[in-house]
Amino acid sequence: MERTIRVTGKGNISVKPDTIRLRISLEDIFREYDDALRHSADSVELLKDMFGGLGYDRKALKTLYFNINTEYESYQDRDKSWKRRFKGYKYTHRMKLEFPADNKQLGKILYALAHCPVSPEFSIEYTVADPEAAKNELLGEAIKDSMAKANVLATAANVKLGNIVNIDYSWGEVDFVSKPLEELSLRCCEDACEPASYNMDIEPDDIDMADTVTVVWNIA
């Protein structure tokens, strides 16, 4: 019977974020479906015009999710029974814009969003421009850790490592994201700011990531 040893290695890396991901959400409700659809399209055009005025390609604003659903509300009838009535059509449009991490540019974008007539909700994330390279580095560290542990175990057990029989990795999504601005009041940025810009002074921490790989070796 073939003898094997199975060892799980853990990789850890710290990556400096170099990209800002701006998540933008628009939603509103209208009595007519056509009005909801038209208002959504018009609002997105306003945002694209705004970003275009800041020097970005209009196509840089990417749609993540779009939907229009019927909305109902509960009410109490004269006989005290609860009923539902049609409220309207609610659209939800979620988008993102990614750009190189730059506090000055971020300040201009936040100022424009705060003074935008469509008043979108938004959040800010820091990430990396090349996540695949970071993932590969993370996997490499996990493999190295597995090999180091396997050699220690083999030496302690007085056996010799043979060929690798199997490498097991979940291939789950690894999202390199830092959120230093969980709560942001744009009013706090008003003081001493340039015209049409907020004074942002943000230095995001490195993104710490970990992942595991399980390797099976023959032993003799």
Briefly describe each language-model feature range.
Residues 1-220:
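Short, charge-dense linear interaction motifs
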